[in-house]
Amino acid sequence: MDEPVRQSYRPDVSFDGGDLDCGSGLLLLIRRHIDPLARGQILEVRSTELSVEQDLPSWCRLTGNELVSSSRNAGTWSFLVCKGSLAEKSESPAPTQPKLGAVRHVEETGISARASKPASILAIAPLSVMGIGSWPRPRWMLQAMHEHVEGRLGDAEFQATADDAVRLSVEAQLRSAVDIVTDGEQRRDNYASFVGGLLENCQLIPLTDLLPLVDDPEEFEKELLSLDVPASEVRHPAVFGKLRRGRPLAAHELEFTQSLTDRPVKIALPGPYLLTRIMWMECISDKVYATREELAGDIVQILREELHELLSAGAALVQFDEPVLTEVVFTGAKNSRSFMCGALSEKGSAEHELAFARELINQVVADVPLHRTAIHVCRGNWTRDESAALSGDYLPLVPTLKALNVGNYLLELCTPRAGEMEALKDLPQDRRVGIGLVNPKTEIVESLEEIIAKAKKAADLFGADRIFLNPDCGFATFADNPVCSSRLAEAKLSALARAAEILRAR
Protein backbone atom coordinates (compact mmCIF):
# COMPACT_ATOMS: atom_id res chain seq x y z
CA MET A 1 0.00 0.00 0.00
CA ASP A 2 1.02 3.65 -0.35
CA GLU A 3 2.73 4.79 2.81
CA PRO A 4 0.96 7.73 4.46
CA VAL A 5 3.06 10.73 5.29
CA ARG A 6 4.60 10.10 8.70
CA GLN A 7 4.00 13.20 10.78
CA SER A 8 3.50 13.64 14.47
CA TYR A 9 0.01 14.72 15.48
CA ARG A 10 -1.67 14.47 18.84
CA PRO A 11 -4.90 12.45 18.52
CA ASP A 12 -8.06 13.97 19.94
CA VAL A 13 -9.46 10.51 20.75
CA SER A 14 -7.81 7.09 20.96
CA PHE A 15 -9.05 3.52 21.35
CA ASP A 16 -7.64 -0.01 21.22
CA GLY A 17 -9.29 -2.35 18.72
CA GLY A 18 -7.23 -5.36 19.80
CA ASP A 19 -7.29 -8.19 17.26
CA LEU A 20 -10.57 -7.18 15.58
CA ASP A 21 -10.41 -6.93 11.81
CA CYS A 22 -12.44 -4.58 9.63
CA GLY A 23 -15.02 -7.25 8.89
CA SER A 24 -15.67 -8.33 12.47
CA GLY A 25 -16.36 -5.18 14.42
CA LEU A 26 -13.41 -2.79 14.14
CA LEU A 27 -15.25 -0.50 11.73
CA LEU A 28 -18.14 -0.22 14.18
CA LEU A 29 -15.74 0.95 16.88
CA ILE A 30 -14.08 3.40 14.51
CA ARG A 31 -17.47 4.81 13.55
CA ARG A 32 -18.52 5.21 17.19
CA HIS A 33 -15.38 7.18 17.96
CA ILE A 34 -15.04 9.25 14.78
CA ASP A 35 -18.65 10.41 14.39
CA PRO A 36 -18.64 12.86 17.34
CA LEU A 37 -15.39 14.47 16.15
CA ALA A 38 -15.34 17.74 14.26
CA ARG A 39 -13.89 17.69 10.77
CA GLY A 40 -10.12 18.00 11.04
CA GLN A 41 -9.90 16.22 14.38
CA ILE A 42 -7.82 13.04 14.67
CA LEU A 43 -8.64 9.56 15.91
CA GLU A 44 -5.96 7.05 16.91
CA VAL A 45 -6.79 3.41 16.20
CA ARG A 46 -4.56 0.85 17.89
CA SER A 47 -4.63 -2.70 16.51
CA THR A 48 -2.73 -5.99 16.62
CA GLU A 49 -4.54 -7.38 13.55
CA LEU A 50 -2.22 -7.47 10.51
CA SER A 51 -5.00 -7.13 7.90
CA VAL A 52 -5.95 -3.69 9.20
CA GLU A 53 -2.83 -2.25 7.56
CA GLN A 54 -4.31 -3.17 4.17
CA ASP A 55 -8.02 -2.59 4.86
CA LEU A 56 -8.02 0.70 6.76
CA PRO A 57 -6.68 2.81 3.85
CA SER A 58 -9.52 1.49 1.66
CA TRP A 59 -12.07 2.41 4.31
CA CYS A 60 -10.60 5.91 4.57
CA ARG A 61 -10.87 6.41 0.81
CA LEU A 62 -14.49 5.18 0.75
CA THR A 63 -15.57 7.40 3.64
CA GLY A 64 -13.65 10.53 2.68
CA ASN A 65 -11.38 10.48 5.73
CA GLU A 66 -7.59 10.88 5.66
CA LEU A 67 -5.12 8.30 6.95
CA VAL A 68 -2.49 10.61 8.43
CA SER A 69 0.12 8.14 9.62
CA SER A 70 0.80 4.58 10.68
CA SER A 71 3.46 3.10 12.92
CA ARG A 72 4.15 -0.20 14.63
CA ASN A 73 5.67 -0.84 18.02
CA ALA A 74 6.04 -4.26 19.70
CA GLY A 75 3.38 -5.83 17.48
CA THR A 76 0.78 -3.10 17.89
CA TRP A 77 -0.13 -0.78 15.04
CA SER A 78 -1.05 2.85 15.64
CA PHE A 79 -3.12 4.50 12.88
CA LEU A 80 -3.98 8.19 12.95
CA VAL A 81 -7.18 8.92 11.01
CA CYS A 82 -8.35 12.47 10.40
CA LYS A 83 -12.08 13.04 10.05
CA GLY A 84 -12.29 14.67 6.65
CA SER A 85 -8.85 16.04 5.80
CA LEU A 86 -5.99 17.66 7.69
CA ALA A 87 -6.63 20.84 5.72
CA GLU A 88 -9.82 21.22 7.76
CA LYS A 89 -8.00 20.92 11.09
CA SER A 90 -8.78 23.80 13.42
CA GLU A 91 -6.06 25.52 15.39
CA SER A 92 -8.35 25.83 18.40
CA PRO A 93 -7.99 23.24 21.18
CA ALA A 94 -10.36 20.29 20.97
CA PRO A 95 -11.95 18.31 23.77
CA THR A 96 -9.89 15.28 24.66
CA GLN A 97 -12.86 12.92 24.61
CA PRO A 98 -16.04 13.86 22.73
CA LYS A 99 -19.27 12.42 24.01
CA LEU A 100 -20.19 9.21 22.18
CA GLY A 101 -23.85 9.92 21.57
CA ALA A 102 -24.65 7.55 18.71
CA VAL A 103 -25.09 4.38 20.71
CA ARG A 104 -26.55 3.20 24.02
CA HIS A 105 -25.43 0.09 25.93
CA VAL A 106 -27.45 -2.01 28.34
CA GLU A 107 -26.96 -5.43 29.81
CA GLU A 108 -30.61 -6.33 30.41
CA THR A 109 -32.16 -8.57 27.79
CA GLY A 110 -35.78 -8.59 28.92
CA ILE A 111 -38.30 -6.59 26.93
CA SER A 112 -41.60 -5.89 28.60
CA ALA A 113 -44.79 -6.58 26.67
CA ARG A 114 -47.16 -4.20 28.37
CA ALA A 115 -50.69 -4.39 27.01
CA SER A 116 -52.78 -1.23 27.40
CA LYS A 117 -56.31 -0.61 26.22
CA PRO A 118 -56.54 1.28 22.90
CA ALA A 119 -58.11 4.72 23.17
CA SER A 120 -61.55 5.03 21.63
CA ILE A 121 -61.26 6.52 18.14
CA LEU A 122 -63.92 7.11 15.49
CA ALA A 123 -63.58 4.79 12.52
CA ILE A 124 -61.78 6.27 9.53
CA ALA A 125 -64.37 7.27 6.95
CA PRO A 126 -64.49 5.67 3.50
CA LEU A 127 -62.70 7.60 0.74
CA SER A 128 -60.41 9.24 3.30
CA VAL A 129 -57.24 10.79 1.92
CA MET A 130 -53.89 10.25 3.61
CA GLY A 131 -50.19 10.20 2.83
CA ILE A 132 -48.17 7.05 3.32
CA GLY A 133 -45.79 8.64 5.80
CA SER A 134 -42.74 10.64 4.78
CA TRP A 135 -42.53 14.25 3.64
CA PRO A 136 -39.49 16.07 2.12
CA ARG A 137 -37.29 17.57 4.87
CA PRO A 138 -36.02 21.16 4.71
CA ARG A 139 -32.26 21.52 4.25
CA TRP A 140 -31.81 22.78 7.80
CA MET A 141 -33.58 19.67 9.08
CA LEU A 142 -31.21 17.43 7.13
CA GLN A 143 -28.23 19.29 8.59
CA ALA A 144 -29.59 18.88 12.12
CA MET A 145 -30.24 15.19 11.46
CA HIS A 146 -26.64 14.55 10.38
CA GLU A 147 -25.21 16.47 13.32
CA HIS A 148 -27.48 14.63 15.76
CA VAL A 149 -26.68 11.13 14.53
CA GLU A 150 -22.96 11.94 14.72
CA GLY A 151 -23.31 13.12 18.31
CA ARG A 152 -22.60 16.79 17.53
CA LEU A 153 -26.11 18.10 18.28
CA GLY A 154 -27.91 17.42 21.54
CA ASP A 155 -31.32 15.79 21.81
CA ALA A 156 -33.08 18.95 22.96
CA GLU A 157 -31.74 21.06 20.10
CA PHE A 158 -32.53 18.32 17.58
CA GLN A 159 -36.11 17.86 18.80
CA ALA A 160 -36.76 21.62 18.73
CA THR A 161 -35.54 21.78 15.14
CA ALA A 162 -37.60 18.73 14.21
CA ASP A 163 -40.70 20.28 15.79
CA ASP A 164 -40.41 23.18 13.34
CA ALA A 165 -40.05 20.78 10.41
CA VAL A 166 -43.10 18.79 11.55
CA ARG A 167 -45.14 21.99 11.76
CA LEU A 168 -44.34 22.72 8.11
CA SER A 169 -45.20 19.17 7.07
CA VAL A 170 -48.53 19.15 8.91
CA GLU A 171 -49.46 22.61 7.62
CA ALA A 172 -48.85 21.43 4.05
CA GLN A 173 -51.04 18.36 4.59
CA LEU A 174 -53.82 20.46 6.10
CA ARG A 175 -53.67 22.87 3.15
CA SER A 176 -54.05 19.79 0.95
CA ALA A 177 -57.23 18.85 2.87
CA VAL A 178 -56.11 15.35 3.84
CA ASP A 179 -58.34 13.47 6.26
CA ILE A 180 -55.57 11.60 8.09
CA VAL A 181 -52.33 13.37 9.05
CA THR A 182 -48.77 12.10 9.59
CA ASP A 183 -45.79 13.99 11.01
CA GLY A 184 -43.93 13.50 7.73
CA GLU A 185 -41.31 11.35 9.47
CA GLN A 186 -39.24 14.50 9.88
CA ARG A 187 -37.22 13.07 12.79
CA ARG A 188 -36.22 9.94 10.88
CA ASP A 189 -33.20 9.47 8.63
CA ASN A 190 -35.29 6.95 6.70
CA TYR A 191 -38.46 4.96 7.09
CA ALA A 192 -36.87 1.97 8.84
CA SER A 193 -33.27 2.47 9.93
CA PHE A 194 -34.20 5.28 12.33
CA VAL A 195 -34.98 2.67 14.98
CA GLY A 196 -31.24 1.93 15.14
CA GLY A 197 -30.71 5.31 16.76
CA LEU A 198 -33.43 4.70 19.37
CA LEU A 199 -33.04 1.07 20.42
CA GLU A 200 -30.39 0.19 22.95
CA ASN A 201 -27.43 -1.93 21.82
CA CYS A 202 -27.88 -0.78 18.23
CA GLN A 203 -25.83 1.67 16.19
CA LEU A 204 -26.44 3.57 12.96
CA ILE A 205 -23.49 3.35 10.58
CA PRO A 206 -23.03 4.54 6.98
CA LEU A 207 -23.44 1.96 4.23
CA THR A 208 -19.81 2.52 3.30
CA ASP A 209 -18.81 0.85 6.57
CA LEU A 210 -20.66 -2.29 5.51
CA LEU A 211 -18.83 -2.77 2.22
CA PRO A 212 -16.15 -5.03 3.77
CA LEU A 213 -18.94 -7.39 4.92
CA VAL A 214 -20.45 -8.13 1.51
CA ASP A 215 -19.20 -10.80 -0.87
CA ASP A 216 -18.39 -8.39 -3.71
CA PRO A 217 -17.87 -4.86 -2.36
CA GLU A 218 -17.23 -3.33 -5.79
CA GLU A 219 -20.39 -4.83 -7.29
CA PHE A 220 -22.46 -3.76 -4.28
CA GLU A 221 -21.10 -0.23 -4.52
CA LYS A 222 -22.07 -0.15 -8.21
CA GLU A 223 -25.60 -1.23 -7.30
CA LEU A 224 -25.90 1.57 -4.76
CA LEU A 225 -24.75 4.09 -7.36
CA SER A 226 -27.20 2.77 -9.96
CA LEU A 227 -30.06 3.16 -7.46
CA ASP A 228 -29.07 6.74 -6.57
CA VAL A 229 -28.34 5.62 -3.01
CA PRO A 230 -25.72 7.89 -1.36
CA ALA A 231 -23.77 5.22 0.52
CA SER A 232 -21.89 7.72 2.65
CA GLU A 233 -25.10 9.42 3.81
CA VAL A 234 -27.57 6.55 4.22
CA ARG A 235 -27.09 4.87 7.59
CA HIS A 236 -27.85 1.28 8.49
CA PRO A 237 -28.55 -0.22 11.94
CA ALA A 238 -25.92 -2.59 13.32
CA VAL A 239 -26.85 -4.81 16.28
CA PHE A 240 -24.08 -5.54 18.79
CA GLY A 241 -26.08 -6.47 21.89
CA LYS A 242 -29.51 -7.72 22.89
CA LEU A 243 -32.04 -5.22 21.58
CA ARG A 244 -34.01 -3.29 24.16
CA ARG A 245 -36.64 -0.60 23.83
CA GLY A 246 -35.57 1.80 26.55
CA ARG A 247 -37.64 4.63 25.09
CA PRO A 248 -40.55 4.90 22.64
CA LEU A 249 -39.90 4.75 18.92
CA ALA A 250 -42.71 7.03 17.78
CA ALA A 251 -44.89 8.03 20.75
CA HIS A 252 -43.31 11.50 20.80
CA GLU A 253 -44.07 11.87 17.08
CA LEU A 254 -47.73 11.09 17.74
CA GLU A 255 -48.03 13.39 20.75
CA PHE A 256 -46.54 16.40 19.00
CA THR A 257 -48.59 15.91 15.82
CA GLN A 258 -51.78 15.62 17.88
CA SER A 259 -50.95 19.01 19.41
CA LEU A 260 -51.03 20.57 15.93
CA THR A 261 -54.34 19.27 14.59
CA ASP A 262 -57.68 17.78 15.59
CA ARG A 263 -57.60 15.42 12.62
CA PRO A 264 -56.81 11.74 13.12
CA VAL A 265 -53.09 10.92 13.13
CA LYS A 266 -51.46 7.90 11.55
CA ILE A 267 -48.08 6.54 12.62
CA ALA A 268 -45.97 4.37 10.32
CA LEU A 269 -43.50 1.85 11.72
CA PRO A 270 -41.13 -0.55 9.97
CA GLY A 271 -42.63 -4.03 9.99
CA PRO A 272 -41.02 -6.91 11.89
CA TYR A 273 -39.94 -8.80 8.78
CA LEU A 274 -38.37 -5.69 7.29
CA LEU A 275 -36.50 -4.92 10.51
CA THR A 276 -35.28 -8.50 10.77
CA ARG A 277 -33.97 -8.39 7.21
CA ILE A 278 -32.29 -5.06 7.89
CA MET A 279 -30.73 -5.92 11.23
CA TRP A 280 -29.60 -9.51 10.66
CA MET A 281 -26.06 -9.28 9.31
CA GLU A 282 -23.47 -12.02 9.53
CA CYS A 283 -20.29 -11.05 11.38
CA ILE A 284 -22.25 -8.52 13.46
CA SER A 285 -25.65 -9.59 14.77
CA ASP A 286 -24.77 -13.28 14.87
CA LYS A 287 -22.29 -12.52 17.65
CA VAL A 288 -25.30 -11.67 19.83
CA TYR A 289 -28.16 -13.72 18.41
CA ALA A 290 -27.63 -17.35 17.48
CA THR A 291 -30.23 -17.23 14.72
CA ARG A 292 -32.23 -14.76 12.67
CA GLU A 293 -35.36 -16.11 14.36
CA GLU A 294 -34.01 -15.23 17.81
CA LEU A 295 -33.37 -11.65 16.69
CA ALA A 296 -36.87 -11.51 15.19
CA GLY A 297 -38.36 -12.53 18.53
CA ASP A 298 -36.98 -9.44 20.25
CA ILE A 299 -38.07 -7.23 17.33
CA VAL A 300 -41.63 -8.57 17.61
CA GLN A 301 -41.75 -7.79 21.34
CA ILE A 302 -40.44 -4.27 20.75
CA LEU A 303 -43.02 -3.54 18.06
CA ARG A 304 -45.85 -5.06 20.10
CA GLU A 305 -45.09 -2.75 23.00
CA GLU A 306 -44.84 0.25 20.68
CA LEU A 307 -48.12 -0.63 18.95
CA HIS A 308 -50.03 -0.90 22.24
CA GLU A 309 -48.67 2.42 23.49
CA LEU A 310 -49.51 4.21 20.24
CA LEU A 311 -53.08 2.91 20.20
CA SER A 312 -53.50 3.78 23.86
CA ALA A 313 -52.28 7.32 23.12
CA GLY A 314 -54.91 7.76 20.41
CA ALA A 315 -53.23 6.89 17.11
CA ALA A 316 -56.05 6.44 14.60
CA LEU A 317 -54.02 3.99 12.56
CA VAL A 318 -50.66 2.26 12.99
CA GLN A 319 -49.18 1.23 9.67
CA PHE A 320 -46.43 -1.36 9.32
CA ASP A 321 -44.19 -0.91 6.28
CA GLU A 322 -43.21 -4.17 4.59
CA PRO A 323 -42.05 -3.23 1.06
CA VAL A 324 -39.39 -5.93 1.17
CA LEU A 325 -42.16 -8.51 0.62
CA THR A 326 -42.10 -7.56 -3.06
CA GLU A 327 -38.34 -8.09 -3.15
CA VAL A 328 -38.99 -11.63 -1.91
CA VAL A 329 -41.39 -12.55 -4.70
CA PHE A 330 -39.93 -10.55 -7.57
CA THR A 331 -36.22 -11.33 -7.15
CA GLY A 332 -36.37 -14.87 -5.74
CA ALA A 333 -33.78 -16.53 -3.49
CA LYS A 334 -30.34 -15.02 -3.93
CA ASN A 335 -26.97 -15.68 -2.38
CA SER A 336 -25.95 -12.06 -2.78
CA ARG A 337 -27.04 -8.96 -0.96
CA SER A 338 -29.20 -6.24 -2.44
CA PHE A 339 -30.29 -2.81 -1.28
CA MET A 340 -33.84 -3.35 -2.55
CA CYS A 341 -36.12 -1.48 -0.08
CA GLY A 342 -33.16 -1.02 2.28
CA ALA A 343 -32.75 -4.68 3.28
CA LEU A 344 -29.21 -6.02 3.06
CA SER A 345 -29.36 -9.48 4.56
CA GLU A 346 -29.67 -12.58 2.45
CA LYS A 347 -32.92 -14.51 2.23
CA GLY A 348 -34.27 -17.97 1.53
CA SER A 349 -36.98 -19.16 -0.84
CA ALA A 350 -40.04 -16.98 -1.38
CA GLU A 351 -42.28 -19.59 0.26
CA HIS A 352 -40.12 -19.71 3.39
CA GLU A 353 -39.70 -15.93 3.64
CA LEU A 354 -43.39 -15.17 3.18
CA ALA A 355 -44.35 -17.70 5.86
CA PHE A 356 -41.77 -16.14 8.18
CA ALA A 357 -43.12 -12.64 7.47
CA ARG A 358 -46.72 -13.71 8.11
CA GLU A 359 -45.77 -15.24 11.43
CA LEU A 360 -43.90 -12.15 12.61
CA ILE A 361 -46.54 -9.63 11.55
CA ASN A 362 -49.39 -11.59 13.11
CA GLN A 363 -47.47 -11.88 16.37
CA VAL A 364 -47.08 -8.10 16.48
CA VAL A 365 -50.75 -7.27 15.81
CA ALA A 366 -52.29 -10.06 17.91
CA ASP A 367 -55.19 -8.96 20.13
CA VAL A 368 -55.51 -5.39 18.84
CA PRO A 369 -58.51 -3.95 16.96
CA LEU A 370 -58.33 -4.96 13.32
CA HIS A 371 -59.40 -1.55 11.98
CA ARG A 372 -56.55 0.25 13.79
CA THR A 373 -53.73 -1.58 11.96
CA ALA A 374 -52.47 -1.40 8.39
CA ILE A 375 -49.77 -2.82 6.16
CA HIS A 376 -48.06 -0.86 3.40
CA VAL A 377 -46.50 -2.65 0.45
CA CYS A 378 -44.71 -1.10 -2.53
CA ARG A 379 -41.82 -1.97 -4.84
CA GLY A 380 -39.10 0.36 -3.58
CA ASN A 381 -38.88 4.12 -3.20
CA TRP A 382 -35.17 4.94 -3.20
CA THR A 383 -34.97 6.50 -6.68
CA ARG A 384 -37.16 8.35 -9.19
CA ASP A 385 -35.99 6.01 -11.92
CA GLU A 386 -38.96 3.73 -12.54
CA SER A 387 -36.80 1.28 -14.48
CA ALA A 388 -34.66 0.64 -11.39
CA ALA A 389 -37.59 -0.37 -9.18
CA LEU A 390 -39.24 -3.79 -8.94
CA SER A 391 -42.14 -4.79 -11.19
CA GLY A 392 -44.94 -7.32 -10.89
CA ASP A 393 -48.59 -7.52 -9.87
CA TYR A 394 -49.85 -8.45 -6.41
CA LEU A 395 -51.02 -11.96 -7.28
CA PRO A 396 -48.03 -13.76 -5.64
CA LEU A 397 -48.63 -11.74 -2.45
CA VAL A 398 -52.40 -12.15 -2.17
CA PRO A 399 -52.28 -15.34 -0.03
CA THR A 400 -49.92 -13.59 2.38
CA LEU A 401 -52.01 -10.41 2.51
CA LYS A 402 -55.16 -12.44 3.16
CA ALA A 403 -53.46 -14.26 6.04
CA LEU A 404 -52.34 -11.07 7.82
CA ASN A 405 -54.48 -9.99 10.76
CA VAL A 406 -54.49 -6.31 9.78
CA GLY A 407 -57.57 -4.35 8.82
CA ASN A 408 -56.14 -2.12 6.09
CA TYR A 409 -53.86 -2.57 3.09
CA LEU A 410 -52.22 0.63 1.78
CA LEU A 411 -50.88 -0.32 -1.61
CA GLU A 412 -48.89 1.01 -4.54
CA LEU A 413 -51.25 0.94 -7.54
CA CYS A 414 -50.67 4.09 -9.60
CA THR A 415 -47.44 3.02 -11.29
CA PRO A 416 -47.83 0.50 -14.14
CA ARG A 417 -45.15 -1.56 -12.36
CA ALA A 418 -47.78 -2.62 -9.81
CA GLY A 419 -49.99 -4.35 -12.37
CA GLU A 420 -53.78 -4.35 -12.34
CA MET A 421 -55.80 -3.98 -9.14
CA GLU A 422 -57.97 -6.94 -10.19
CA ALA A 423 -55.23 -9.16 -8.77
CA LEU A 424 -56.48 -8.05 -5.33
CA LYS A 425 -60.15 -8.88 -5.81
CA ASP A 426 -60.04 -11.82 -3.37
CA LEU A 427 -58.88 -9.79 -0.36
CA PRO A 428 -61.14 -10.36 2.68
CA GLN A 429 -64.41 -8.42 2.59
CA ASP A 430 -63.90 -7.08 6.11
CA ARG A 431 -60.62 -5.34 5.17
CA ARG A 432 -60.18 -1.94 3.54
CA VAL A 433 -57.80 -1.03 0.75
CA GLY A 434 -55.80 2.17 0.31
CA ILE A 435 -55.49 2.73 -3.44
CA GLY A 436 -52.28 4.32 -4.71
CA LEU A 437 -53.60 6.99 -7.10
CA VAL A 438 -50.63 9.35 -7.46
CA ASN A 439 -47.01 8.44 -8.08
CA PRO A 440 -44.54 10.38 -5.89
CA LYS A 441 -41.73 9.65 -8.36
CA THR A 442 -43.21 11.55 -11.33
CA GLU A 443 -42.78 15.27 -11.96
CA ILE A 444 -46.39 15.81 -13.05
CA VAL A 445 -49.56 16.00 -10.98
CA GLU A 446 -52.01 13.33 -12.05
CA SER A 447 -55.19 14.74 -13.60
CA LEU A 448 -58.43 14.81 -11.66
CA GLU A 449 -60.07 12.71 -14.37
CA GLU A 450 -57.36 10.06 -14.14
CA ILE A 451 -57.59 9.85 -10.35
CA ILE A 452 -61.39 9.67 -10.32
CA ALA A 453 -61.51 7.02 -13.04
CA LYS A 454 -59.13 4.75 -11.15
CA ALA A 455 -60.87 5.38 -7.83
CA LYS A 456 -64.24 4.48 -9.39
CA LYS A 457 -62.70 1.29 -10.72
CA ALA A 458 -61.52 0.45 -7.20
CA ALA A 459 -64.96 1.26 -5.78
CA ASP A 460 -66.56 -1.10 -8.28
CA LEU A 461 -64.07 -3.83 -7.37
CA PHE A 462 -63.98 -3.48 -3.57
CA GLY A 463 -66.97 -1.28 -2.73
CA ALA A 464 -66.78 2.46 -2.09
CA ASP A 465 -67.08 1.87 1.65
CA ARG A 466 -63.83 -0.13 1.61
CA ILE A 467 -61.36 2.22 -0.08
CA PHE A 468 -59.02 5.05 0.88
CA LEU A 469 -57.10 7.36 -1.45
CA ASN A 470 -53.33 7.62 -1.02
CA PRO A 471 -50.04 8.03 -2.92
CA ASP A 472 -48.10 4.94 -3.98
CA CYS A 473 -45.50 5.56 -1.28
CA GLY A 474 -43.91 8.28 0.81
CA PHE A 475 -42.52 11.44 -0.73
CA ALA A 476 -39.12 11.18 0.99
CA THR A 477 -38.58 7.64 2.25
CA PHE A 478 -34.84 8.32 2.57
CA ALA A 479 -34.21 11.75 4.06
CA ASP A 480 -31.22 12.57 1.87
CA ASN A 481 -32.82 11.20 -1.28
CA PRO A 482 -36.40 12.50 -1.58
CA VAL A 483 -38.27 11.45 -4.71
CA CYS A 484 -40.50 14.53 -4.67
CA SER A 485 -40.36 18.20 -3.70
CA SER A 486 -42.61 19.48 -0.94
CA ARG A 487 -44.47 21.72 -3.37
CA LEU A 488 -45.20 18.83 -5.72
CA ALA A 489 -46.14 16.55 -2.82
CA GLU A 490 -48.70 19.11 -1.63
CA ALA A 491 -50.15 19.39 -5.14
CA LYS A 492 -50.50 15.61 -5.46
CA LEU A 493 -52.28 15.30 -2.10
CA SER A 494 -54.55 18.22 -3.04
CA ALA A 495 -55.52 16.39 -6.23
CA LEU A 496 -56.46 13.33 -4.18
CA ALA A 497 -58.57 15.46 -1.82
CA ARG A 498 -60.44 17.13 -4.69
CA ALA A 499 -61.13 13.72 -6.23
CA ALA A 500 -62.43 12.39 -2.91
CA GLU A 501 -64.76 15.37 -2.56
CA ILE A 502 -66.24 14.72 -5.99
CA LEU A 503 -66.60 11.00 -5.33
CA ARG A 504 -68.38 11.59 -2.01
CA ALA A 505 -70.89 13.90 -3.70
CA ARG A 506 -71.93 11.26 -6.24
What is the predicted role of each segment?
Residues 93-506:
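Domain-level signal for soluble alpha/beta catalytic cores
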Residues 2-99, 456:
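Domain-level signature for proteins that mediate thiol-based redox and metal-cofactor handling
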